[in-house]
Amino acid sequence: AKTVYYMSMEFLMGRALGNNLINMTAYKDVKEALEEMNIDLNVIEDQEPDAALGNGGLGRLAACFLDSLATLNYPAYGCVEVPDNWLKEGNPFEIRREEYAKEVRFGGNIRFEKDPVTGKDKFIQENYESVMAVPYDMPIVGYGNHVVNTLRVWDAKPITDFKLDEFDRGNYHKAVEQENLAKLIVDVLYPNDNHYSGKELRLKQQYFFISASLQALIEKYKKKHGDIRKLHEKVVIQMNDTHPTVAVPELMRLLIDVEGLSWEDAWEVTSKTCAYTNHTIMAEALEKWPIDLFSKLLPRIYQIVQEIDRRFLIKVREMYPGNEEKVRKMAILMNGQVRMANMAIVAGFSVNGVAQLHTEILEKQELKDFYQMMPEKFNNKTNGITQRRFLAHGNPLLADWIT
Protein backbone atom coordinates (compact mmCIF):
# COMPACT_ATOMS: atom_id res chain seq x y z
CA ALA A 1 0.00 0.00 0.00
CA LYS A 2 1.06 3.60 -0.56
CA THR A 3 1.71 5.96 2.33
CA VAL A 4 0.02 9.36 2.07
CA TYR A 5 1.97 12.42 3.18
CA TYR A 6 -0.64 15.14 3.63
CA MET A 7 1.18 18.49 3.45
CA SER A 8 -0.77 21.42 4.85
CA MET A 9 0.08 24.80 6.39
CA GLU A 10 -2.89 24.24 8.73
CA PHE A 11 -4.24 21.38 10.85
CA LEU A 12 -7.10 22.51 13.06
CA MET A 13 -7.02 19.35 15.17
CA GLY A 14 -9.02 20.37 18.22
CA ARG A 15 -8.73 18.49 21.51
CA ALA A 16 -7.50 14.92 21.25
CA LEU A 17 -8.59 13.16 24.46
CA GLY A 18 -12.32 12.84 23.80
CA ASN A 19 -11.82 12.14 20.11
CA ASN A 20 -9.26 9.40 20.83
CA LEU A 21 -11.52 7.76 23.41
CA ILE A 22 -14.43 7.75 20.95
CA ASN A 23 -12.27 6.28 18.19
CA MET A 24 -11.03 3.60 20.62
CA THR A 25 -14.74 2.93 21.43
CA ALA A 26 -13.84 3.51 25.09
CA TYR A 27 -15.50 6.87 25.79
CA LYS A 28 -18.58 5.59 27.65
CA ASP A 29 -16.58 3.06 29.69
CA VAL A 30 -14.04 5.68 30.78
CA LYS A 31 -16.79 8.23 31.54
CA GLU A 32 -18.67 5.72 33.73
CA ALA A 33 -15.50 4.59 35.52
CA LEU A 34 -14.61 8.20 36.34
CA GLU A 35 -18.16 8.94 37.51
CA GLU A 36 -17.81 6.14 40.09
CA MET A 37 -14.87 8.13 41.48
CA ASN A 38 -16.88 11.38 41.33
CA ILE A 39 -14.72 12.71 38.51
CA ASP A 40 -16.30 14.44 35.52
CA LEU A 41 -14.64 13.47 32.22
CA ASN A 42 -15.76 16.76 30.66
CA VAL A 43 -13.77 18.68 33.29
CA ILE A 44 -10.66 16.65 32.39
CA GLU A 45 -11.25 17.30 28.69
CA ASP A 46 -11.48 21.02 29.38
CA GLN A 47 -7.93 20.99 30.77
CA GLU A 48 -6.54 20.07 27.35
CA PRO A 49 -5.49 23.08 25.27
CA ASP A 50 -7.06 23.29 21.82
CA ALA A 51 -4.53 22.05 19.26
CA ALA A 52 -5.14 24.89 16.83
CA LEU A 53 -2.49 24.72 14.11
CA GLY A 54 -4.56 26.91 11.85
CA ASN A 55 -7.53 29.22 11.78
CA GLY A 56 -10.07 28.07 9.21
CA GLY A 57 -11.75 25.49 7.04
CA LEU A 58 -8.52 24.50 5.31
CA GLY A 59 -7.06 23.29 8.62
CA ARG A 60 -10.24 21.57 9.75
CA LEU A 61 -10.50 19.71 6.45
CA ALA A 62 -6.90 18.53 6.89
CA ALA A 63 -7.68 17.28 10.41
CA CYS A 64 -10.81 15.45 9.22
CA PHE A 65 -8.80 13.83 6.45
CA LEU A 66 -6.28 12.45 8.96
CA ASP A 67 -9.12 11.01 11.05
CA SER A 68 -10.71 9.47 7.96
CA LEU A 69 -7.43 8.05 6.62
CA ALA A 70 -6.73 6.30 9.94
CA THR A 71 -10.31 5.00 10.15
CA LEU A 72 -10.16 3.62 6.60
CA ASN A 73 -6.80 1.97 7.37
CA TYR A 74 -4.66 4.05 4.98
CA PRO A 75 -1.09 4.63 6.23
CA ALA A 76 -0.68 8.42 6.42
CA TYR A 77 1.37 11.25 7.88
CA GLY A 78 0.16 14.81 8.32
CA CYS A 79 3.03 17.31 8.03
CA VAL A 80 2.99 20.87 9.40
CA GLU A 81 5.12 23.52 11.12
CA VAL A 82 4.61 24.35 14.79
CA PRO A 83 4.26 27.88 16.23
CA ASP A 84 6.62 28.64 19.13
CA ASN A 85 3.85 29.09 21.73
CA TRP A 86 2.33 25.72 20.77
CA LEU A 87 0.92 24.12 23.92
CA LYS A 88 3.10 25.94 26.46
CA GLU A 89 2.07 23.57 29.25
CA GLY A 90 3.16 20.53 27.23
CA ASN A 91 1.09 17.92 25.42
CA PRO A 92 0.75 14.33 26.66
CA PHE A 93 -0.03 13.16 23.10
CA GLU A 94 3.17 14.59 21.65
CA ILE A 95 6.53 12.80 21.35
CA ARG A 96 9.73 14.69 20.48
CA ARG A 97 11.76 12.73 17.87
CA GLU A 98 15.21 14.30 18.05
CA GLU A 99 16.68 11.37 16.08
CA TYR A 100 14.74 12.45 12.97
CA ALA A 101 15.91 16.09 13.00
CA LYS A 102 16.78 17.55 9.57
CA GLU A 103 18.81 20.55 8.41
CA VAL A 104 16.99 23.14 6.27
CA ARG A 105 19.00 25.74 4.32
CA PHE A 106 18.11 29.24 3.13
CA GLY A 107 19.81 31.78 0.88
CA GLY A 108 23.44 31.82 -0.21
CA ASN A 109 24.59 31.04 -3.72
CA ILE A 110 24.82 27.96 -5.96
CA ARG A 111 28.18 26.80 -7.29
CA PHE A 112 28.16 24.54 -10.34
CA GLU A 113 30.83 21.91 -11.05
CA LYS A 114 31.29 18.61 -12.88
CA ASP A 115 31.82 15.48 -10.84
CA PRO A 116 35.31 14.27 -11.87
CA VAL A 117 34.31 10.61 -11.48
CA THR A 118 30.80 10.44 -12.96
CA GLY A 119 30.88 13.54 -15.17
CA LYS A 120 27.49 14.55 -13.76
CA ASP A 121 26.59 18.16 -13.03
CA LYS A 122 26.80 19.09 -9.34
CA PHE A 123 25.06 22.04 -7.70
CA ILE A 124 26.54 23.08 -4.37
CA GLN A 125 24.84 25.59 -2.06
CA GLU A 126 27.30 27.92 -0.30
CA ASN A 127 27.12 30.82 2.19
CA TYR A 128 23.68 29.74 3.35
CA GLU A 129 21.85 30.10 6.68
CA SER A 130 20.41 26.94 8.18
CA VAL A 131 18.23 25.70 11.01
CA MET A 132 17.45 22.28 12.43
CA ALA A 133 13.90 21.01 12.04
CA VAL A 134 12.96 18.81 15.01
CA PRO A 135 9.78 16.71 14.71
CA TYR A 136 7.12 16.13 17.34
CA ASP A 137 4.79 13.22 16.55
CA MET A 138 1.13 13.14 17.58
CA PRO A 139 -0.97 9.96 17.23
CA ILE A 140 -4.06 10.00 15.00
CA VAL A 141 -6.33 7.18 16.16
CA GLY A 142 -8.59 5.40 13.67
CA TYR A 143 -12.14 4.48 14.66
CA GLY A 144 -12.54 0.97 16.05
CA ASN A 145 -9.66 -0.58 14.10
CA HIS A 146 -6.44 -0.36 16.21
CA VAL A 147 -4.83 1.85 13.52
CA VAL A 148 -2.72 4.81 14.63
CA ASN A 149 -1.30 7.24 12.08
CA THR A 150 0.87 10.28 12.80
CA LEU A 151 0.69 14.06 12.63
CA ARG A 152 4.29 15.24 12.44
CA VAL A 153 4.78 18.79 13.69
CA TRP A 154 8.14 20.47 12.94
CA ASP A 155 9.83 22.86 15.36
CA ALA A 156 12.85 25.02 14.44
CA LYS A 157 16.04 25.00 16.52
CA PRO A 158 19.42 26.66 15.91
CA ILE A 159 22.05 24.35 14.38
CA THR A 160 24.61 25.44 16.95
CA ASP A 161 24.25 27.08 20.32
CA PHE A 162 25.02 30.72 21.01
CA LYS A 163 28.40 31.60 19.40
CA LEU A 164 30.36 32.89 22.39
CA ASP A 165 33.55 33.48 20.36
CA GLU A 166 31.71 35.82 17.97
CA PHE A 167 30.16 37.62 20.93
CA ASP A 168 33.57 38.04 22.57
CA ARG A 169 34.84 39.66 19.36
CA GLY A 170 32.02 42.20 19.62
CA ASN A 171 29.98 40.71 16.78
CA TYR A 172 26.70 40.36 18.65
CA HIS A 173 24.50 40.00 15.56
CA LYS A 174 26.57 37.11 14.18
CA ALA A 175 26.56 35.43 17.58
CA VAL A 176 22.78 35.20 17.71
CA GLU A 177 21.83 35.00 14.01
CA GLN A 178 21.11 31.25 13.96
CA GLU A 179 19.13 31.46 17.16
CA ASN A 180 17.15 34.39 15.78
CA LEU A 181 16.45 32.62 12.47
CA ALA A 182 15.09 29.54 14.25
CA LYS A 183 13.00 31.65 16.63
CA LEU A 184 11.59 33.78 13.83
CA ILE A 185 10.44 30.79 11.77
CA VAL A 186 8.20 29.49 14.55
CA ASP A 187 7.26 32.72 16.36
CA VAL A 188 4.36 33.78 14.15
CA LEU A 189 2.23 31.20 12.34
CA TYR A 190 0.51 33.72 10.05
CA PRO A 191 2.80 36.69 9.44
CA ASN A 192 1.28 39.69 7.69
CA ASP A 193 2.56 39.20 4.14
CA ASN A 194 1.59 42.54 2.61
CA HIS A 195 5.19 43.71 3.07
CA TYR A 196 8.55 42.19 2.09
CA SER A 197 9.70 40.86 5.48
CA GLY A 198 6.30 39.22 6.08
CA LYS A 199 6.44 37.53 2.67
CA GLU A 200 10.00 36.36 3.35
CA LEU A 201 9.02 34.84 6.70
CA ARG A 202 5.99 33.06 5.24
CA LEU A 203 8.05 31.56 2.41
CA LYS A 204 10.68 30.45 4.95
CA GLN A 205 7.98 28.76 7.02
CA GLN A 206 6.56 26.93 4.03
CA TYR A 207 9.92 25.73 2.76
CA PHE A 208 11.02 24.81 6.30
CA PHE A 209 8.31 22.24 6.98
CA ILE A 210 8.24 20.95 3.39
CA SER A 211 12.00 20.37 3.15
CA ALA A 212 12.12 18.65 6.55
CA SER A 213 9.10 16.45 5.72
CA LEU A 214 10.49 15.40 2.33
CA GLN A 215 13.95 14.62 3.72
CA ALA A 216 12.32 12.45 6.40
CA LEU A 217 10.00 10.61 4.01
CA ILE A 218 12.86 9.83 1.60
CA GLU A 219 14.99 8.51 4.47
CA LYS A 220 12.11 6.34 5.70
CA TYR A 221 11.35 5.08 2.18
CA LYS A 222 14.98 4.15 1.43
CA LYS A 223 15.35 2.17 4.66
CA LYS A 224 12.31 0.10 3.79
CA HIS A 225 12.29 -0.09 -0.01
CA GLY A 226 15.68 1.00 -1.39
CA ASP A 227 15.28 2.10 -5.01
CA ILE A 228 14.40 5.81 -5.01
CA ARG A 229 13.23 5.56 -8.64
CA LYS A 230 10.19 3.65 -7.39
CA LEU A 231 9.22 6.21 -4.74
CA HIS A 232 5.89 6.86 -6.48
CA GLU A 233 4.91 3.21 -6.06
CA LYS A 234 4.90 3.58 -2.26
CA VAL A 235 4.37 7.30 -1.55
CA VAL A 236 1.84 10.01 -2.41
CA ILE A 237 2.46 13.66 -1.50
CA GLN A 238 -0.90 15.41 -1.23
CA MET A 239 -0.51 19.21 -1.30
CA ASN A 240 -3.41 20.88 0.53
CA ASP A 241 -3.80 24.17 -1.39
CA THR A 242 -0.90 26.19 -2.82
CA HIS A 243 1.05 26.74 0.44
CA PRO A 244 2.92 23.38 0.31
CA THR A 245 3.55 23.37 -3.47
CA VAL A 246 7.23 24.20 -3.01
CA ALA A 247 7.31 20.42 -2.40
CA VAL A 248 7.54 19.97 -6.19
CA PRO A 249 10.94 21.65 -6.77
CA GLU A 250 12.22 20.53 -3.36
CA LEU A 251 11.54 16.88 -4.22
CA MET A 252 13.30 17.45 -7.55
CA ARG A 253 16.28 18.97 -5.70
CA LEU A 254 16.57 16.03 -3.32
CA LEU A 255 16.28 13.48 -6.14
CA ILE A 256 18.82 15.22 -8.40
CA ASP A 257 21.33 16.84 -6.02
CA VAL A 258 21.25 14.34 -3.14
CA GLU A 259 20.13 11.05 -4.72
CA GLY A 260 21.97 11.58 -8.03
CA LEU A 261 19.05 11.02 -10.42
CA SER A 262 18.96 12.59 -13.88
CA TRP A 263 16.43 15.36 -14.53
CA GLU A 264 14.27 12.99 -16.57
CA ASP A 265 14.20 10.28 -13.89
CA ALA A 266 13.56 12.80 -11.11
CA TRP A 267 10.67 14.35 -13.06
CA GLU A 268 9.18 10.92 -13.73
CA VAL A 269 9.15 10.22 -9.98
CA THR A 270 7.95 13.69 -8.94
CA SER A 271 5.11 13.87 -11.46
CA LYS A 272 3.82 10.47 -10.32
CA THR A 273 4.16 11.26 -6.59
CA CYS A 274 2.67 14.77 -6.15
CA ALA A 275 -1.04 15.63 -6.13
CA TYR A 276 -2.73 18.99 -5.59
CA THR A 277 -5.99 20.01 -3.90
CA ASN A 278 -7.32 23.40 -5.03
CA HIS A 279 -9.51 25.25 -2.52
CA THR A 280 -10.37 28.48 -4.29
CA ILE A 281 -11.74 29.74 -7.60
CA MET A 282 -10.36 33.24 -7.04
CA ALA A 283 -7.30 33.76 -9.22
CA GLU A 284 -5.94 36.43 -6.86
CA ALA A 285 -5.94 33.91 -3.98
CA LEU A 286 -3.70 31.44 -5.84
CA GLU A 287 -0.31 31.93 -4.24
CA LYS A 288 2.37 33.87 -6.11
CA TRP A 289 5.86 34.84 -4.96
CA PRO A 290 8.02 37.73 -6.20
CA ILE A 291 10.88 36.22 -8.20
CA ASP A 292 13.47 38.46 -6.52
CA LEU A 293 12.45 37.15 -3.07
CA PHE A 294 12.05 33.52 -4.17
CA SER A 295 15.41 33.35 -5.99
CA LYS A 296 17.29 35.03 -3.12
CA LEU A 297 15.81 32.87 -0.37
CA LEU A 298 15.73 29.55 -2.30
CA PRO A 299 18.37 29.88 -5.05
CA ARG A 300 18.58 26.21 -6.04
CA ILE A 301 14.81 25.77 -5.86
CA TYR A 302 14.41 28.75 -8.19
CA GLN A 303 16.82 27.21 -10.73
CA ILE A 304 14.68 24.06 -10.74
CA VAL A 305 11.45 26.06 -11.14
CA GLN A 306 13.02 27.86 -14.13
CA GLU A 307 13.78 24.52 -15.79
CA ILE A 308 10.30 23.09 -15.05
CA ASP A 309 8.79 26.22 -16.60
CA ARG A 310 11.08 26.14 -19.65
CA ARG A 311 10.30 22.50 -20.45
CA PHE A 312 6.58 22.93 -19.87
CA LEU A 313 6.28 25.97 -22.15
CA ILE A 314 8.00 24.03 -24.95
CA LYS A 315 5.10 21.53 -24.72
CA VAL A 316 2.49 24.32 -24.62
CA ARG A 317 3.95 25.93 -27.77
CA GLU A 318 4.08 22.55 -29.53
CA MET A 319 0.40 21.90 -28.73
CA TYR A 320 -0.80 25.47 -29.37
CA PRO A 321 1.61 27.00 -31.94
CA GLY A 322 1.45 30.79 -32.13
CA ASN A 323 -0.86 31.09 -29.12
CA GLU A 324 1.26 33.27 -26.85
CA GLU A 325 -1.81 34.27 -24.83
CA LYS A 326 -2.09 30.65 -23.66
CA VAL A 327 1.62 30.60 -22.88
CA ARG A 328 1.21 33.76 -20.80
CA LYS A 329 -1.70 32.29 -18.82
CA MET A 330 -0.09 28.89 -18.20
CA ALA A 331 3.53 29.91 -17.49
CA ILE A 332 4.88 29.27 -14.00
CA LEU A 333 7.17 32.32 -14.19
CA MET A 334 5.44 35.45 -15.49
CA ASN A 335 5.44 39.19 -14.73
CA GLY A 336 8.14 38.84 -12.09
CA GLN A 337 6.23 36.20 -10.13
CA VAL A 338 6.41 32.47 -9.37
CA ARG A 339 2.87 31.12 -9.79
CA MET A 340 2.63 28.20 -7.38
CA ALA A 341 -0.75 26.83 -8.48
CA ASN A 342 0.47 26.56 -12.08
CA MET A 343 3.51 24.61 -10.88
CA ALA A 344 1.36 22.24 -8.81
CA ILE A 345 -0.89 21.53 -11.81
CA VAL A 346 2.05 21.00 -14.18
CA ALA A 347 3.83 18.63 -11.79
CA GLY A 348 0.94 16.78 -10.15
CA PHE A 349 -0.73 13.59 -11.37
CA SER A 350 -4.03 14.74 -9.83
CA VAL A 351 -5.75 18.12 -9.42
CA ASN A 352 -8.95 18.09 -7.40
CA GLY A 353 -11.57 20.59 -6.37
CA VAL A 354 -13.50 20.19 -3.13
CA ALA A 355 -17.12 20.31 -4.38
CA GLN A 356 -18.74 19.37 -7.69
CA LEU A 357 -19.63 22.96 -8.61
CA HIS A 358 -16.21 24.21 -7.53
CA THR A 359 -14.46 21.61 -9.71
CA GLU A 360 -16.65 22.48 -12.71
CA ILE A 361 -15.79 26.18 -12.34
CA LEU A 362 -12.08 25.28 -12.21
CA GLU A 363 -12.39 23.18 -15.38
CA LYS A 364 -14.54 25.62 -17.35
CA GLN A 365 -13.23 28.98 -16.15
CA GLU A 366 -10.32 29.51 -13.76
CA LEU A 367 -8.08 26.61 -14.88
CA LYS A 368 -9.67 26.08 -18.30
CA ASP A 369 -6.37 26.22 -20.22
CA PHE A 370 -4.84 23.50 -18.06
CA TYR A 371 -8.00 21.38 -18.22
CA GLN A 372 -8.01 21.57 -22.04
CA MET A 373 -4.37 20.46 -22.19
CA MET A 374 -4.45 17.76 -19.49
CA PRO A 375 -8.08 16.83 -18.64
CA GLU A 376 -7.07 13.45 -17.23
CA LYS A 377 -5.55 15.15 -14.17
CA PHE A 378 -8.73 16.87 -13.01
CA ASN A 379 -11.22 15.28 -10.60
CA ASN A 380 -13.54 16.17 -7.75
CA LYS A 381 -13.35 15.14 -4.09
CA THR A 382 -16.31 16.57 -2.19
CA ASN A 383 -15.36 17.73 1.30
CA GLY A 384 -16.87 16.17 4.39
CA ILE A 385 -16.39 16.18 8.15
CA THR A 386 -15.85 13.50 10.75
CA GLN A 387 -19.28 12.83 12.19
CA ARG A 388 -17.78 11.31 15.34
CA ARG A 389 -16.22 14.57 16.57
CA PHE A 390 -19.02 16.87 15.43
CA LEU A 391 -22.03 14.66 16.14
CA ALA A 392 -21.21 11.71 18.42
CA HIS A 393 -18.95 13.80 20.66
CA GLY A 394 -20.37 17.28 20.05
CA ASN A 395 -24.03 16.33 20.55
CA PRO A 396 -24.34 12.82 22.03
CA LEU A 397 -28.10 13.17 22.67
CA LEU A 398 -28.76 13.90 19.00
CA ALA A 399 -26.38 11.09 17.97
CA ASP A 400 -28.27 8.61 20.18
CA TRP A 401 -31.60 9.80 18.77
CA ILE A 402 -30.42 9.39 15.16
CA THR A 403 -28.94 5.94 15.72
Where do the PLM segments sit?
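A conserved ligand/cofactor-binding region detector
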Residues: 1-403
